[in-house]
């Protein structure tokens, strides 16, 4: 399990990384920005990370993106990294800075800059004092639920279990403990025998909805796997 300090530091870096990735597009926070303005902002983000003492903790992949100058043509590979925004809530929930994890039915769009006090008055020590870690049991439960969502997407897309009985498949693959997790979980319908999003079972979702759910569940599971293991950020291996 990662320490409170490690989790908070990683969340801060991820938010700065998300800001950098967003600069690949001309529209930033609803305002059209010139190439020079976006490059200036990229440098400002890097300087802020260095000044606050976070730059030494960024991963190799992140460093390559932070140090890549903004070009006229958007880098699609960098834009894909914006999916990491789904990693924020798992970390902030574990730190006690956000009350609960959002449902899996839509992307998280909340602005976490105020939560992490981004800006000139930012203080890691002050933020750390505000953090109150939830229990290991709660974290493990969140992780296992995210894993089941991730598995359900894989099953839906690839028919891994070749079964229409989702609970039976979960029992056969993961065991009784994972069935018990679903008993009081609001996004699992025992009658429909499936996870529910926006009133539809996963089986009823169209391709775009399944793809969105895949991104949400995969990124959240990635965050929880990092939280609960000794793996470095770029080296987390997802196994279902």
PLM regions and their residue ranges:
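Extended, charge-rich alpha-helical interface modules
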Residues: 1-240
């Amino acid at each position: 399990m990662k320490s409170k300090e490690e989790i908070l530091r990683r969340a801060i870096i991820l938010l700065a990384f998300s800001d950098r990735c967003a600069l690949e597009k001309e529209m930033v926070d609803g305002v059209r920005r010139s190439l020079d303005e976006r490059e200036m902002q990229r440098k400002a983000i890097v300087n802020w990370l260095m000044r606050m003492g976070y730059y030494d903790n960024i991963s190799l992949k992140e460093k390559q993106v932070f140090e890549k100058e903004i070009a006229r043509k958007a880098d699609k590979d960098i834009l894909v990294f914006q999916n990491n925004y789904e990693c924020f809530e798992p970390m902030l929930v574990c730190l006690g800075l956000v009350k609960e994890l959002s449902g899996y039915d839509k992307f998280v769009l909340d602005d976490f800059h105020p939560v992490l006090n981004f800006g000139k008055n930012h203080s890691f020590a002050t933020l750390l004092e505000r953090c109150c870690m939830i229990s290991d049991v709660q974290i493990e439960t969140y992780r296992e639920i995210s894993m089941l969502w991730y598995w359900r997407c894989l099953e839906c897309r690839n028919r891994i279990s070749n079964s229409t009985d989702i609970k039976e498949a979960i029992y056969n693959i993961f065991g009784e403990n994972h069935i018990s997790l679903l008993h009081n979980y609001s996004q699992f319908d025992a009658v429909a025998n499936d996870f529910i999003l926006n009133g539809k079972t996963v089986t009823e979702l169209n391709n775009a909805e399944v793809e969105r759910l895949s991104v949400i569940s995969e990124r959240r599971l990635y965050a929880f796997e990092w939280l609960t293991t000794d793996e470095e950020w770029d080296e987390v291996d997802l196994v279902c």
